[in-house]
């Protein structure tokens, strides 16, 4: 009589935040490329290391997400609320694209529906 061992492997996606952070990091460090006269992709700036198979590359630059662009569907960032103390994507420094921002305070009164 023989015994049979069973091995099950599970593939699971990483945490959504980790995947997003990794993609953003690759996007931020993507290499600008152009086609040479022979139709081969070459780096725009040869001072940087050549991209590997794990790096992102691009030919056309990303649109300016700070300004409204109807052809790309970007609404821009003008008029959006930002968080003055945040260093993240919702922070005023990043979201306002260096244009400055207006500050205001609001007082909001809410009924708490407390029971004693």
UniProtKB/Swiss-Prot annotation:
A lipid is attached at residue 1 (O-palmitoleoyl serine). InterPro entries: Wnt, Wnt_C. Glycans are attached at residues 69, 83. Keywords: Developmental protein, Disulfide bond, Extracellular matrix, Glycoprotein, Lipoprotein, Secreted, Wnt signaling pathway. It is found in: Secreted, Extracellular space, Extracellular matrix; Secreted. GO terms for cellular component: extracellular space. One of its GO terms (biological process) is cell fate commitment. It comes from the Eukaryota. Palmitoleoylation is required for efficient binding to frizzled receptors. Depalmitoleoylation leads to Wnt signaling pathway inhibition. SMART domains: WNT1 (SM00097). Disulfide bonds join 82-97. GO terms for molecular function: cytokine activity; frizzled binding. Its main location: secreted. Coiled coil: none annotated. Belongs to the Wnt family. Ligand for members of the frizzled family of seven transmembrane receptors. Can activate or inhibit canonical Wnt signaling, depending on receptor context. Required during embryogenesis for extension of the primary anterior-posterior axis. This is Protein Wnt-5a. The lineage of its organism: Eukaryota, Metazoa, Chordata, Craniata, Vertebrata.
């Amino acid at each position: 009589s023989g015994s049979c061992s069973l091995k099950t492997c599970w593939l699971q996606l990483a945490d959504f935040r980790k995947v997003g952070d990794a993609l953003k990091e690759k996007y931020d460090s993507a290499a600008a490329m152009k086609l040479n006269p022979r139709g081969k992709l070459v780096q725009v700036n040869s001072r940087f290391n050549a991209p590997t198979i794990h790096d992102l590359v691009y030919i056309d630059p990303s649109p300016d997400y700070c300004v409204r662009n109807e052809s790309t569907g970007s609404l821009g960032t003008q008029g959006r609320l930002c968080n003055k103390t945040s260093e993240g994507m919702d922070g005023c420094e990043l979201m306002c694209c260096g244009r400055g921002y207006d500050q205001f305070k609001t007082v909001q009164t809410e009924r708490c529906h407390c029971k004693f």
